[in-house]
Structure formats: C-alpha cells, structure tokens
C-alpha cells in the first residue's frame, strides 16, 4: 500500500492525534535555534494569525475542487441524519435524551418511556429547548448536563455554559412544570460542582473568592448549602490543597447502603478519598489511582497499577470485588472479576441488581461477560454477542426505584416501580461495516429486543475489514484494522491504493471498530483504504498500554505509528 494519493472526492484530514501527554520540552528541544518556538504561545496574535492563514490555504484548496460541493452536501446530510441512535438515560419511568440537529443546533432535552422508545417513530416530549431558552434570555447557552434527585427525579440541577466554555451556571429546574424553580438553587458562572443531598440541601464547590479554587481553577472546597441561606455563608465541610486539580464528592443513595465519599483529585488519574462517617472523615484505604465503586455490600476496585492483597498481587487493569464492610474494617480480602492478559483488557462495567456486566476488549473488539454473586463468590457466564465489533452496555437498574434485595443482614427495600428493569440493560453494537444498533437485553439470556438501528450511510457491498499486527521498534506487536474497498484485500493489494492512516495514542482512549458515514462514503466507497492503528498511549490493552507511552516514553506512540505505516508498505 502507498499512503500518498489524495482522496478522489474530498480531501479528508488525517493525522496522528497524539494527546498532549508528552514530556515537558527539554533544554535540548527548546533552543533558540527552533524557528517555531513562537507558536508555543497559542493565544498570541502572531500564532493565531498564522493558524488563520493555514486554515485559509486549506479552505481554498478544498473549496476550489469540482467535487467539493457534492461531497460537502452529502456529508451534511450524513451528519444531520435524524435516525441517529438516541443516547438515553433512565430517570424513574422516563428515558431522557439530549438531541441536536439542523433545526435545533443548541439542542433539546427530551423524554419518552420505554414503550415509546420501542416505537418506530418515537413521540418525544420536549423538556428544555436550548435554542428557545437562549433566545428568550439573550444568551448563547450550551448544554452541560443535569443532575436529578431520585426517586421522583422531578427536581434537577441544570448546568449551562456560555458558548461551550468550561465554566457553567447551575440552576434548579422542575421537569414537570418545565420551568426553572423561582428562588431555587442557583450558582453563578464558575467551574462548579453541585450535588444533591436531599430536596433542600446540596454540596457545592465553586468560586467564592480568594482561596476557594485550586491552581487549576477548579473548586478547592466543598460546602453544605441549605435552601434559603446565602451561598457565601455556608459551612465548609471538606477542602483540598491549592496544588490539587479539584475536590469533589460522590453520594450513594442506595437505601440501606447510603455512603458519601469526598475526594481530592491530586492529578488527572489519582485521587485521595475520604468516607463520611457521622461527622467524621475517614481516609478510604484504596489505591489513589484506582476507580472505586460500591454495589450495596460489595466494593469494586478497578486498578491502574498493581495491588497486593494478602499474598496475591493483582495486575494493573484488574477489576476486584471485596466485602465492603470487611474492607472498611481493615480486613483485606479480594476476588478478581477480571484480570488482563496480553490480548484482553476491561473497557467498562455496569451493574444490574444482581449482576455485574463486563465489556471486555479481546484484541480490540468487544466481548461481554456476566458475573452473578452466589453466596460469598461470583460466578461467570459468557454472553453470546456479535464479534468482532464494539459493544456498549448500560444497566437500567435504579435502586431508588427498583428496590434493594435483603442481604448482609440488611432489610429488603421495596420497589416503587414494578421492578421490571432491575435486570435489563441497553446493548449497543457497531463495527466498520454495520451501523449502530440499540437493543434491550436481560441478564441470564442471550436474546435481545431490537429498539433502534441506523440505516446504512454508504454501500458496503464488496468492502471488508481485517486486523493485522505490525512490530514496533522495541519489538511490541501493534494491532491495526484495515477497511478495504471493493475489489481490494491483503492478497490483491496493488501497492498504489490511496491510504488513510489514523491513530490516537493518548489519554487511555481506545480505538475499537467504529462506523463512519464520512470515511465510508467519501473515502472507502471511492477506492481508498482506511487504516486504524491501535498505538500505545491509548487504552486498547489497559493501563499498561497507556503508561508505556507517556512522559519520556511518548516517542513510542510515534514509533508504533511508523511501524504500522511501514507494515502497510
């Protein structure tokens, strides 16, 4: 293959988008001999003018091509397609979605029911129209999400930003009346965090003047704010250090298992956590770089570095479970639900009432496992699912609505619903040639109910995808996917096919198979070859794959990318 030919339709940008995790520039690299050092000041007028000039050159090169206009029109049609799969979130009996299209560029917050979601044409009910709200308030509002108080999920803390900035305004909203609450909770524009405690109390971290923010500009303190009291006079209940990235709080409202955990984020991946016991903050004895969650009487630890528990050491990338009360009492005993291998890593997990569902990447494609607690241990079941491709799992269980079973000496908590969603989950699937689909799954079964599926965005007849492996400079095997156009393949490649090579290699982000109407219609359908390189720095094989190419080792990401290019040739 020869990665040199331009696209016969539209010039698509392709680059190795290596995340900004490289080592700080050394004296050797930052010398006065570098003629481009002035570009380091990214906000300077000179740097911005240079970028504008390069953009203008690119626009001129693209827009003067005779095939630009039809390609542009086709891409607009693809990206504005109304059959996109809604990304719904369950709140009680309602399923909420945030939707943007050509008619609603700022977006709609809308809702339906599960029965409504099953319909071919969903009858959505608009809750907030961002375009209308912005026009009425003369603001350029961008949606930043909302946090609603269960089990009623009527009152929500809505976050809005001006023009998409990091700073937000937080306002209390009633989803039944579809109005902001007069005299309700409201936090002025800042990089804030606000979390419900109960209907009249929240935890808030925000900019309240000198000393309230970290050096990174995020909250340094958490206050307990009671409705009707001035925000500035509320008591500080937790604080971090100025050098921390931020502080925050997570609240588990599961009936009978209520827990509040404060945390100091000391950097991007590490946090120090404290469990609130009465009026006392107790350090949580877990690794700073682990992800921590509680599932009623079970503690789950997702490791980013090795951890020794008793006589056993668990590798980075493992998912451990432990008895929560025993662990908090200092009794260290854990069982692995997942241990990574050279070819398998844990992409994500989600919990129903009685199961933990794992999305496992096996050579960068998804497999699904179910784990169910059986007495004091967990037992596994493999879930039959399409392969190779990308799967997403989102459990629908809500303990505030679906109830809590009796266990660990605690009483059962009755459901306020019929409990029919306690063991259901949303299952999404996509690969290079099959558009997104959304199904409703149930634990203990491989059957799934189709809910939504996108129409194909390009003619995939004759196309096929394959996976290959290159050898990097240090001997590491680097996987990559190739999407072949009709009439081409590894055995029939002529050596002159236009080839687009893409990689990322940062922030532990993985690149499993995906479906792209843009690449498919404007590149592969016109004879181009698409190559996706799973280079180090990403998350394809867990934390170790990421950590192998950060800091002083960032060059390994580039070495991997070069190795794939050479393997193609």
Regions found by a protein language model. Give the residues of each.
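Bacterial N-terminal signal peptides that target proteins for export
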Residues: 1-10
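Intrinsically disordered, low-complexity segments enriched in Ser/Pro/Gly/Ala and basic residues
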Residues: 4, 23-25, 491
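Serine-hydrolase catalytic core recognition
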Residues: 85-88, 256-257, 353, 385-387, ...
């Amino acid at each position: 293959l020869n990665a040199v030919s331009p696209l016969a339709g539209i010039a698509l940008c392709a680059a190795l988008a290596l995340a900004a995790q490289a080592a700080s520039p050394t004296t050797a690299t930052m010398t006065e001999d570098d003629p481009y050092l002035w570009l380091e000041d990214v906000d300077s007028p000179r740097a911005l003018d240079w970028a504008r000039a390069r953009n203008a050159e690119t626009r001129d090169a693209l827009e003067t091509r005779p095939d630009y206009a039809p390609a542009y029109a086709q891409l607009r049609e693809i990206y504005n397609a109304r059959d996109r799969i809604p990304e719904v979130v369950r709140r009680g009996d309602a399923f909420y979605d945030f939707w943007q299209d050509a008619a609603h560029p700022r977006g709609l917050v809308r809702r339906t029911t599960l029965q409504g979601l099953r319909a071919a044409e969903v009858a959505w009910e608009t809750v907030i129209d961002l375009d209308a709200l912005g026009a009425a308030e003369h603001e350029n509002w961008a949606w930043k999400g909302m946090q609603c108080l269960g089990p009623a999920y009527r009152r929500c803390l809505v976050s809005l930003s001006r023009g998409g900035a990091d700073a937000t305004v937080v306002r209390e909203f009633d989803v039944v009346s579809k109005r902001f609450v007069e005299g309700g909770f409201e936090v002025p524009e800042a990089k804030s965090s606000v979390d419900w405690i109960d209907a009249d109390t929240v935890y808030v971290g925000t900019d309240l003047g000198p000393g309230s923010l970290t050096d990174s500009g995020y909250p340094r303190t958490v206050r307990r704010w009671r409705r009707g009291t001035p925000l500035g006079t509320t008591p500080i209940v937790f604080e971090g250090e100025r050098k921390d990235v931020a502080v925050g709080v997570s609240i588990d409202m599961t009936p009978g298992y209520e827990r509040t955990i404060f945390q100091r984020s000391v950097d991007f991946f590490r946090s120090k956590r404290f469990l609130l016991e009465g009026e006392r903050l107790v350090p949580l004895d877990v690794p700073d770089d682990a992800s921590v969650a509680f599932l009623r009487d079970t503690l789950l630890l997702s490791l980013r570095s090795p951890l020794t528990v008793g006589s056993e050491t668990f590798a980075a990338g493992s998912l451990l479970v432990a008895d929560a009360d025993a662990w908090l009492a200092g009794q260290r005993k854990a069982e692995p639900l997942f241990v990574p291998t050279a070819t398998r890593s844990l992409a994500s997990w989600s919990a129903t009432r009685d199961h933990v569902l794992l999305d496992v990447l096996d050579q960068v494609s998804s497999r699904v496992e179910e784990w169910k607690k059986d007495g004091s241990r967990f037992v596994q079941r493999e879930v039959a699912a399409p392969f190779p491709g990308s799967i997403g799992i989102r459990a629908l269980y809500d303990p505030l609505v679906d109830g809590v079973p009796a266990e660990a000496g605690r009483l059962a908590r009755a459901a306020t619903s019929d409990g029919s969603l306690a063991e259901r989950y949303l299952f999404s699937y996509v690969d290079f040639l099959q558009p997104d689909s959304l199904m409703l799954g149930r634990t203990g079964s491989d059957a799934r109910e189709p809910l939504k599926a996108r129409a194909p965005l390009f003619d995939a007849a004759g196309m096929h995808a394959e996976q290959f492996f290159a050898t990097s400079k240090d001997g590491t095997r680097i996987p990559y996917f190739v999407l072949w156009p009709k009439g081409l393949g590894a055995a029939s490649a002529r050596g002159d096919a236009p080839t687009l090579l893409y990689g990322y290699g940062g922030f532990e982000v993985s690149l499993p198979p995906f479906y792209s109407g843009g690449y498919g219609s404007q590149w592969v359908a016109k004879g181009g070859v698409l190559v996706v390189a799973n280079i180090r720095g990403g998350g394809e094989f867990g934390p170790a794959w990421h950590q192998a190419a950060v800091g002083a080792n960032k060059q390994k990401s580039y070495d991997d990318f070069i190795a794939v290019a050479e393997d193609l040739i």
